Amino acid sequence: MKKIIALHALFFSLLILLSGCTNGTIVNPTAEGQAFQINTYNYSDNHYLLDTIYKSNFIDFMAEGMLNTPENINRQISPDNFEVWVQTTNFTADRKFASMLIDLPSLPASGQYNDSFYVPGQIPGKRYFGLFRKLNSSEYYVNYQAGFIGLRINIPDNDYAGVTFKQNGTGQTFGTNSSNFTQDTLVLKMIKAGNIFPQTDTLAWEMKMKNVYRIPVIPILETGFEFQVNFVDPANPTPSPSLPNGRTVLNVVGLDRFIGHGPQLGQDNYFDFLNGRTIITETGDVIFPILRPFYDGILEATNNGFTGGDTTLICKAIYTKLKSEASIAPNNSMYIIKGRVKNF
């Protein structure tokens, strides 16, 4: 019986890896569970803030699981008429042409964008005109309070994606959705640009989240789930759960802030398994509460009040360079994400 279970685990892991939706590696699948390992520069490419202003919402929500400041509460997104569109080359009846802007303003009081918004044009990383298809709700998930989207499908690097949404508190609408507007061409708020470059496509780069890691096994069950972030000192390559100053890495990157499931604050040296917040069990997404955990999180933890943080321990390239460059940058292997999951 154990051999059958082990074979099932191996087959399931291979099936998920072949689907192309994950960023990690399965290590030694057994009947006791499947170990995984993920490099810190290999974050998910499927998660985006709806706008850079939602950085504040994200931090606010991840701290307590709810929004606290009036500004963030006002920006909370309505699920009504929320739409996601991705670039396509397939001409069918349900496709739409769309003009997409990274810095799209809210819809004017007249209820119509100026004609200039509908004119075909392209500025890399900022504006795009093309053919798009509307995603169904099974192809993505949205955190309406934190203001980010997770795509359940992969989109080619050179393709664009955009959304339409309305803010509950302000009443502002961004984009023209297909339910309320009958024009042949839509106007969309760009969330993903094609082939972005950090140095030139600054807004598009900021909106791409680099703090979500997709575990290569789904669905995730809390029972038997293990998640660790270890520090690897170049002078002593044995992985350690702690930084040289004794702070545990899991706490430093924001994933061990509570006793159990909370709300009591404190470290228990276990991953804070908060479904819908630090983990999405259906997709295997682990969401770090800090947008740049291996940069800002490390600096804050090593700040002794005089130096501003130990810059020799940060992985800046993750957040300033493309993955291909970050993978060969200094310190690229200083931290390793690993764990184990049982899903049967």
Feature names for model-found ranges:
Residues 2, 21-344:
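Surface-exposed, low-hydrophobicity segments enriched in Gly/Pro/acidic/Ser residues
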Residues 8-19:
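Bacterial N-terminal signal peptides
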Residues 1-9:
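Bacterial N-terminal signal peptides that target proteins for export
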